[in-house]
From Swiss-Prot:
The lineage of its organism: Viruses, Monodnaviria, Shotokuvirae, Cossaviricota, Papovaviricetes. This is Regulatory protein E2. It is found in: Host nucleus. Residues 294-376 are annotated as: DNA-binding domain. Its main location: host cell. Residues 211-271 are annotated as: Disordered. One of its GO terms (cellular component) is host cell nucleus. Plays a role in the initiation of viral DNA replication. A dimer of E2 interacts with a dimer of E1 in order to improve specificity of E1 DNA binding activity. Once the complex recognizes and binds DNA at specific sites, the E2 dimer is removed from DNA. E2 also regulates viral transcription through binding to the E2RE response element (5'-ACCNNNNNNGGT-3') present in multiple copies in the regulatory regions of the viral genome. Activates or represses transcription depending on E2RE's position with regards to proximal promoter elements including the TATA-box. Phosphorylated. GO terms for molecular function: DNA binding; DNA-binding transcription factor activity; nucleotide binding. It comes from Human papillomavirus 28. There is a cross-link at K301 (Glycyl lysine isopeptide (Lys-Gly) (interchain with G-Cter in SUMO)).
């Protein structure tokens, strides 16, 4: 107990030094969140040992310290990734990297240079609400998870930013129009200017995509339909849809027999949960495991931030147990609140089995086995 108390004192003293230092360097904020992780880990261990007090400090319940530790890990990993970007030398204060800032809309982004926007519902000053418009928003690319800085915008419709050609609203004024008003109309006051309804020019998040030819012989009707859908998609949805179509084409070339499917299931570890997001009427089957053009993979499904943390740990300590990992991805038909995926690629089934028997997957992440065509 004495050792635990001493470690906790040292950890908290270092945190106080950082608060007094009031640094604007990113490395100091990373150290702060590292200490937050250590503090909650020590408190968790103390409670696990049956301690309710360490000196004059009350030890919180296990559920509280566990939640705080997970929160600290999430922010810490995000800052470590930010340190590898072009914005590592920018000014970053404790306020800029706080959990409250991380959870403020747009969530899971870093934000700077906030400006107050006043919205008067029904044009009545007594029915006004204030929102924060962030002029600088730091978000991650869909493809490689690199941090980029985009500009925030204000329109009659709401507050938004444009990233990789997609317009994302983090505040929509119409959601509050009938909460604070009655007519469903409002005025936007920002920077000494007023945006009225008649001045509203909605910005579309879609762009025209050049029509493509049929994907393969015999699929002309289907290809023309898919092309018309692609014309209204953003780059993320279009990219995911084309990958899906490419996957479906390859499955037609390598159909799997029922006997092969049974053999494959029998050869896989029993302690791994196998699931499928398709129903039993899905016309496409998994690629032939013995095909030289197929590679074994594991799809990890869960909360996107948990997946990023787990992928980061794999990259640091288990790099020899797999070939490569994908960025975090979602099906384009699902909302932002749905579970995300990370795909891990292996050079052989023995390497995948070694990975599954060695690496402990966090409880909140679901493991799905499969194969993928070796297209790269």
């Amino acid at each position: 107990m004495e050792t635990l108390a001493n470690r906790l004192d040292v950890c908290q003293d270092k945190m106080l030094e950082l608060y007094e230092k009031d640094s604007n360097k990113l490395e100091d904020q990373i150290m702060h969140w590292q200490l937050m992780r250590v503090e909650n880990a020590l408190l968790y261990k103390a409670r696990e040992c049956g301690l309710t007090h360490i000196g004059h400090q009350v030890v919180p319940p296990l559920s509280v310290t566990k939640a705080k530790a997970r929160s600290a890990i999430e922010v810490h990993v995000a800052l470590l990734q930010l340190q590898e970007s072009a914005y590592a030398q920018d000014s970053w204060t404790l306020r800029d990297t706080s959990r409250e800032m991380w959870d403020t809309v747009p969530k899971k982004c870093w934000k700077k240079r906030g400006v107050t926007v006043e919205v008067r519902y029904d044009g009545d000053e007594t029915k006004s609400m204030c929102y924060v418009h962030w002029r600088d928003i730091f978000t991650q690319n869909y493809s490689d998870d690199k941090w980029v800085k985009v500009a925030g915008h204000v329109s009659y419709e709401g507050l938004y930013y444009i990233h990789e050609g997609e317009q994302t609203f983090y505040v929509k004024f119409k959601d509050d129009a009938y909460v604070y008003g009655e007519t469903g109309k409002w005025e936007v006051h920002v920077g000494g200017k007023v945006i009225h309804h008649h001045a509203f020019d909605p910005v579309s998040s879609t762009r025209e995509i050049p029509a493509a030819g049929p994907l393969c012989t015999g699929d002309t009707t289907k290809a023309s339909t898919e092309t018309s859908v692609g014309a209204t998609e953003g780059p993320q949805q279009k990219r995911q849809r084309l990958e899906t179509l490419n996957w479906e084409q390859q499955q037609r070339q390598y159909p799997q027999t029922p006997s092969t499917q049974t053999t494959e299931r029998a050869s896989q570890p029993l302690d791994v949960t196998r699931t499928s997001d398709c129903d039993t009427t899905c016309p496409y089957t998994v690629g032939h495991p013995s095909d030289p053009d197929c590679a074994p993979v594991v799809h990890l499904k869960g909360d996107p931030n948990c997946l990023k943390c787990f992928r980061y740990r794999l990259h640091k300590g288990k790099r020899k147990l797999y070939c490569k990992t994908s960025s975090t991805w979602r099906w384009s038909c699902e909302s932002e609140n749905q579970a995300a995926f990370v795909t891990i690629w292996y050079t052989s089934y023995s390497q995948r089995n070694e990975f599954l028997s060695t690496v402990k997957v966090p409880p909140g992440i679901q493991v799905i086995l499969g194969h993928m065509s070796m297209f790269v």
